[in-house]
A protein has these predicted regions:
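Basic, flexible Lys/Arg- and Gly-enriched helix-loop patches that mediate nucleic-acid binding at interfaces
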Residues: 1-278
């Protein structure tokens, strides 16, 4: 049975489908003796090369997902030419496959990031087709008027695309911010464009001084996961995310992983401090 090259590599944990498609477009992938093209179909017997290194036609990688609480000051890419610390430096090692990020957060944004071993799942969770909600806590400087809120919910042209918040909730009382020139809001987006939250507020003349993602679809950042730490999603939670994007995945009862996840959660909970926004 054959399948598209980009899906073949994504399902084996080499990267998200979007990443693999970019590698193919850049000429970094060869199929047998020819430069690969997007849409090429492959079977287990074909020879695939990435950056002149032969790709092992390994079995499908088991699907795992971790929830990571990103601190400010870390870069969300796998490499950084300026030598800044990476989120990937804090992730647990894998025997097979690699961690693939479901989207990114910029260096000055903190909060929830999802990482998975399933490239196809990562691609679908990011894809605009599924319009998965992302919720953020955002602190802006200045007095926000009703007209600003209405404009942000109606839609703003940023570049050549319209963006908008699906919802905006005032959160000052909840977070007990005593500095009234700083206003906290919880906002919801149905997409993950670069700097979208900041750009929307800037369109109304407001600077964002703090930004924290608190949920991605049904996954909420647990209060026991402190900045720089992570926790595994259960098989039930993984299946829920996969169903959300119409993806059938094989889940095996990995007792070793379950025990490791339970130990990790007990360790994090024993520290006893909740994640707070300052």
């Amino acid at each position: 049975m054959d399948e598209k090259l980009q899906k073949f590599l994504a399902n084996r944990g080499y990267g998200s489908r979007r990443q693999v498609e970019q590698w193919i477009s850049d000429g970094r992938v060869r199929l047998n003796n020819s430069v690969a093209k997007i849409g090429d179909r492959v079977s287990i017997n074909d020879s695939i090369f990435l950056d002149n290194k032969k790709v092992r036609s390994r079995e499908l990688v088991e699907t795992h997902i971790i929830v990571y609480n990103k601190p400010e000051g870390l870069v969300s890419t796998t490499k950084d030419t300026r030598g800044r610390p990476l989120v990937f430096d804090n992730l647990p090692p894998l025997k097979r496959g690699k961690w693939i990020s479901v989207g990114r957060l910029d260096i000055n944004t903190s909060g929830l990031m999802l990482f998975t071993t399933n490239g196809e799942l990562a691609n679908r969770l990011m894809h605009p087709k599924y319009s998965i909600d992302r919720k953020y806590l955002v602190r802006v400087y200045g007095k926000v008027e009703k007209k600003n809120i209405e404009a942000l919910k109606k839609g703003i042209l940023i570049g050549d695309e319209y963006s908008r918040f699906k919802s905006i909730e005032f959160k000052n009382e909840v977070l007990k911010d005593q500095v009234r020139l700083n206003n906290w809001f919880q906002v919801t987006l149905g997409s993950g464009k670069n700097r979208e939250v900041r750009s929307l507020w800037e369109s109304q003349g407001f600077d964002v001084s703090r930004l924290k993602r608190i949920s991605y679809g049904p996954v909420i950042l647990p209060s026991f996961v402190r900045p720089g730490n992570y926790t595994y999603l259960s098989e039930k939670e993984v299946a829920q995310l996969a169903n959300l994007v119409n993806l059938n995945i094989a889940l095996r009862n990995d007792l070793t992983l379950q025990k490791k996840s339970q130990r990790n959660e007990r360790r994090l909970r024993s520290k006893g401090s909740k994640v707070k926004v300052r």
